[in-house]
């Protein structure tokens, strides 16, 4: 994966308002904002197509990005993205500043691996994914692009919870930090495949005798 998807050029935007944003979009520019830390929020403009291409990669949403803001590097995380309801177009993007030495809080996707090696799945079980990402906190340098959920040893009827996951060093689950069972969320369950509806032979026989 090219590091280019994690580096974006941006410029400070002073022409604000809906009309200005519409003009930017007609020029294939993307309005956005950077906030967080002790600095004031900054409205910015980016190249829409470059951001749209980067947004096709899952890691774009769980990776510390570098915005070259008028030539000055600023480290950020994607916090929100507004898309057009039916066109392949991004309407607005929000970034949060990453502050050196401060923990970041963000969602990281889960990758379910080795399902094909699970005896339960081989026996016809179906893996029901309850969540596909979890909220974590860590130092920026420790932020993983994804967290693996190893399904190889999961048995039929078993539910994997947050507390069963192996998190990378320095990474903590926000939910588990609340220290009660209600926040030990179910991640995935392997369930038996639903049985086909059984024929009511007695009913059929009774109907044939009438």
UniProtKB/Swiss-Prot annotation:
It holds the Pfam family Ribosomal_L25p. Keywords: Ribonucleoprotein, Ribosomal protein, RNA-binding, rRNA-binding. SUPFAM superfamilies: Ribosomal protein L25-like (SSF50715). GO terms for biological process: translation. Gene3D superfamilies: Ribosomal protein L25, beta domain, Ribosomal Protein L25, Chain P. CDD domains: Ribosomal_L25_TL5_CTC. Belongs to the bacterial ribosomal protein bL25 family. CTC subfamily. This is Large ribosomal subunit protein bL25. It comes from Alteromonas mediterranea (strain DSM 17117 / CIP 110805 / LMG 28347 / Deep ecotype). The lineage of its organism: Bacteria, Pseudomonadati, Pseudomonadota, Gammaproteobacteria, Alteromonadales.
């Amino acid at each position: 994966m090219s590091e280019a998807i994690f580096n974006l050029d941006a410029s400070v935007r002073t022409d604000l308002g809906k009309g200005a944003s519409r003009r930017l979009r007609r020029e294939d520019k993307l309005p956005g904002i950077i906030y967080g830390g002790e600095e004031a929020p900054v409205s910015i403009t980016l190249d829409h197509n470059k951001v749209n291409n980067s947004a096709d990669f899952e890691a774009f949403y769980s990776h510390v990005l570098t915005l070259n803001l008028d030539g000055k590097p600023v480290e950020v995380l994607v916090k929100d993205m507004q898309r057009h309801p039916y066109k392949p177009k991004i309407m607005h993007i929000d970034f949060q500043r990453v502050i050196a030495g401060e923990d970041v809080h963000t969602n990281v996707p889960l990758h379910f691996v080795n399902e094909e090696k699970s005896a339960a799945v081989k026996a016809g079980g179906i893996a029901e994914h309850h969540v596909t990402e979890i909220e974590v906190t860590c130092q920026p340098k420790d932020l993983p692009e994804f967290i693996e959920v190893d399904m190889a040893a999961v048995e039929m009827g078993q539910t994997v919870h947050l507390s069963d996951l192996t998190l990378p060093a320095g990474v903590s689950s926000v939910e588990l930090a609340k220290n009660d069972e209600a926040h030990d969320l179910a991640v995935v369950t392997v369930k038996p495949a639903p049985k086909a509806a059984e024929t009511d032979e007695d009913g059929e026989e009774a109907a044939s005798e009438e």
